[in-house]
């Protein structure tokens, strides 16, 4: 967990002016950062499937589609009248960055460069 927190902390100041907006931890919390969630400011994260550089760096979209669009789930979804705009936003813009202990300084640097952050 210490390595994950250290790696997550390295992203914060260096991605401020990038194409990503990091999801902030709640006040008074100390997350373990299994992965660092970030919002793509423009574009669609599903396009990352074709971005071999992003995939090689461990950058992945979080949610491929809305739950009510998954096979067998539509009939189990109750409130479908509003189209789930918040969930749709997540499927289009939320991605995660790796924070595990095998992420080295060069990996962090490459992720920051990929995101257009400050090296």
Give the residues covered by each predicted segment.
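PLP-dependent aminotransferase class I/II
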Residues: 1-119
């Amino acid at each position: 967990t210490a390595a994950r927190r250290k790696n997550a902390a390295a992203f914060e100041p260096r991605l401020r002016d990038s194409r990503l907006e990091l999801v902030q931890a709640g006040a008074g919390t100390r997350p373990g950062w299994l992965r660092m969630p970030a919002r793509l400011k423009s574009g669609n994260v599903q396009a990352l499937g074709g971005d071999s550089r992003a995939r090689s760096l461990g950058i992945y979209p979080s949610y491929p589609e809305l739950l009510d669009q998954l096979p067998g789930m539509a009939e189990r979804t109750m409130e479908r009248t509003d189209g789930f705009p918040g969930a749709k936003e997540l499927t289009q813009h939320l991605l995660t960055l790796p924070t595990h202990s095998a992420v080295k300084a060069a990996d962090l640097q490459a992720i920051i460069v990929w995101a257009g952050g400050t090296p």
